[in-house]
């Protein structure tokens, strides 16, 4: 039954531009990590464990190794200009490839409660994971992107391994356009169909 599925409280996507504007005004690494998580529609653990070695700023790609992914398959994330500017804001000289991108104040990775705490402090009763639903609803309601491209951004496994490998290669440009459209929407530059 559908009731058995655990639904994470999501922000209606119509409220996303206003929320993102408020989030960008907040200080601290956790707010930056949350902003990046929303822009890339990644899972919070993927962002919290992210290292600089996974990022290719020139190619504008973030490659999450399979051992850090829920489905154990490497996940390539096209980075929108907005996502890149978050990375530029936290980048410092002398960082090594295995340095965490969003380090906890005392070193190491941020805890899973840190990003949720930002939402709580902002007075929202939504979950970090629910932001992925906001993206999915937005994509389904307002864009013409194919469903498998929308799902691929969420690293949901659709189809056989061979099919997925084929589609991954084909879909990167579409996914880049999708991530750029999502970032533009989050920034209040929405052009709905």
Spans of features found by a protein language model:
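Hydrophobic alpha-helical scaffolding
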Residues: 6-10, 37, 73, 77, ...
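Basic, Lys/Arg- and aromatic-enriched nucleic-acid-binding interface segment
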Residues: 1-50, 58, 64, 69-73, ...
């Amino acid at each position: 039954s559908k009731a058995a599925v655990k639904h994470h409280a999501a922000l209606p996507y119509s409220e996303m531009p206003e929320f993102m504007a408020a989030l960008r005004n907040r200080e601290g690494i956790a707010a930056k990590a949350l902003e990046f998580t929303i822009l890339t529609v990644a899972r919070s653990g993927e962002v919290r464990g992210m290292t600089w070695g996974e990022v290719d700023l020139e190619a504008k790609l973030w490659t999450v190794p399979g051992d850090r992914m829920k489905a154990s398959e490497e996940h390539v994330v096209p980075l929108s200009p907005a996502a890149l500017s978050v990375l530029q804001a936290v980048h410092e000289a002398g960082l090594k490839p295995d340095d965490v991108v969003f380090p906890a104040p005392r070193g190491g990775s941020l805890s899973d409660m840190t990003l949720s705490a930002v939402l709580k402090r902002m007075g929202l009763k939504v979950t970090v994971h629910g932001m992925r639903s906001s993206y999915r609803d937005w994509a389904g309601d307002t864009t013409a992107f194919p469903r498998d491209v929308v799902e691929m951004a969420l690293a949901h496994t659709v189809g056989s391994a061979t099919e997925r490998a084929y589609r991954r290669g084909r879909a990167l440009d579409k996914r880049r356009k999708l991530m750029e459209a999502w970032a533009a929407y989050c920034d209040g530059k929405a052009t709905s169909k």
